[in-house]
């Protein structure tokens, strides 16, 4: 679009001034983008303790990404690739850097994102690397077809393990890419995202979660396979927690993982620029006022009023920096049911999910170092 001098420039300049004034007013009144209001967990998101009552399949230190090939579950454990055989984790391969994303293709090739800004295509059978390509801050991977890989890049400023730093710096430099394995070409899809953390193919449409925006978006393409975006709409917003990986079921429903809760104290800190700058520079990251995979393990952690233990007991409804939550969405992308591990629970930091037949749902509890199995009735 051509911009004519004079009137058009005045309109653009005036809009910028009005936007700046609106931002200042919102900051003063605590509304709009400066609001610290957190939606309650109610209705289909009402708290329960189902995750704490489910079967513990196995314990894996720093378990994160789950993916399925055939009848087996594969997982990441820091820099190790693990295969779960008869409820026992077996190390398949060890890498020099932390694994940040996993995705199997129909041909049996495993895409692996590493924290050194690299994506590998790995032959699990031969235990060999087929190809290696550079991508910044890989947070999620998805094989669209045997030759096409969708890549989520969380940030241009921080690596995937530094997700808390990106949140505290109000990061919005994430992006989605399409990579052709045969030609090794990259195609940019969409940018300026606030930490895209999950990808899912649904009827030739792309579903992705945006953690710091507390939302899930649906991209529709103009034609199958061309990756020209026809529409990009927000289908789920104002979530009470930070969304992560997404997996679809055989009946085209969705399981959405949410790895940590939002709360008003964190939302308030995110509006205080000077305070955040001092906290990031002077305080150990473990003790930031920020979400966590697991909290309550150190007396030096920040304490919220409702989180004080009474008679040595932490109330399940206490405000916490960690939580366990996974939500099932129906075909209209509305919450159908939710599984929780509350403040006093033992299945926090649900980062990833994988589905097997007969309603089996496997979940990685990064905060409590275990894989749990939920069987839907």
Model feature map: region roles:
Residues 152-171, 259-321:
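Short, conserved, GDST-rich strand-edge loop motifs in beta-rich repeat architectures
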Residues 350-377:
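Blade-level signature of beta-propeller repeat domains, shared across WD40, Kelch, NHL, RCC1
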Residues 117, 126-144, 152-165, 171-173:
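Asp-box/WD-like beta-propeller blade repeats and closely related beta-sheet repeat scaffolds
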Residues 84-88, 123-126, 180-184, 220-225, ...:
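Short loop/turn segments that connect beta-strands within beta-propeller blades
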Residues 52-58, 88-94, 126-132, 185-190, ...:
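A short beta-strand motif characteristic of beta-propeller blades
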Residues 59-69, 96-107, 134-148, 155-157, ...:
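Beta-rich, blade/repeat-based domains predominating
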Residues 74-79, 111-117, 150-167, 207-213, ...:
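Conserved beta-strand positions in repeat-built beta-propeller and related beta-rich domains
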Residues 11, 20, 30-62, 329-342:
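A short helix->beta-strand "capping" segment at the edge of beta-propeller domains
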């Amino acid at each position: 679009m051509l911009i004519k001098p004079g009137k058009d420039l005045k309109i653009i300049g005036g809009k910028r001034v009005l936007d700046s004034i609106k931002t200042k007013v919102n900051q003063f009144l605590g509304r709009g983008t400066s609001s610290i209001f957190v939606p309650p967990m109610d209705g289909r998101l009402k708290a329960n303790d189902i995750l704490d009552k489910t079967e513990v399949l196995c314990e894996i230190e720093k378990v994160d990404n789950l993916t399925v090939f055939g009848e087996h579950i594969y997982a990441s454990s820091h820099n190790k690739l693990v295969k779960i055989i008869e409820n026992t984790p077996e190390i398949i391969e060890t890498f020099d850097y932390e694994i940040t994303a996993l995705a199997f293709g129909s041909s049996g090739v495993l895409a692996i994102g590493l924290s050194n800004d690299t994506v590998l295509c790995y032959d699990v059978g031969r235990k060999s690397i087929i190809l290696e390509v550079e991508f910044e801050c890989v947070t999620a991977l998805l094989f669209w077809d045997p030759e096409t890989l969708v890549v989520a890049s969380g940030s241009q400023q921080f690596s995937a393990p530094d997700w808390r730093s990106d949140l505290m710096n109000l990061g919005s430099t994430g992006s989605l890419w399409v990579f052709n394995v045969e030609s090794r070409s990259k195609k940019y899809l969409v940018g300026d995202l606030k930490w895209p953390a999950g990808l899912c193919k649904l009827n030739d449409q792309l579903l992705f979660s945006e953690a710091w925006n507390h939302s899930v978006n649906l991209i529709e393409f103009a034609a199958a396979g061309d990756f020209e975006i026809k529409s990009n709409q927000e289908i789920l917003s104002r979530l009470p927690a930070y969304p992560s990986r997404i997996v679809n079921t055989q009946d085209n429903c969705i399981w959405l993982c949410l790895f940590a809760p939002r709360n008003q104290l964190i939302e308030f800190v995110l509006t205080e620029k000077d305070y955040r700058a001092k906290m990031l520079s002077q305080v150990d990251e473990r003790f930031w006022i920020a979400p966590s995979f697991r909290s309550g393990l150190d007396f030096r952690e920040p304490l919220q009023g409702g989180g004080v233990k009474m008679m040595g007991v932490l109330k399940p409804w206490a405000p916490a920096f960690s939580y366990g939550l996974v939500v099932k969405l129906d075909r209209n992308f509305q919450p159908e049911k939710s599984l929780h591990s509350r403040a006093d629970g033992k299945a926090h930091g649900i980062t990833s999910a994988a589905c097997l037949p007969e309603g089996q749902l496997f979940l990685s509890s990064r905060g409590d170092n275990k894989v749990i199995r939920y069987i839907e009735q």
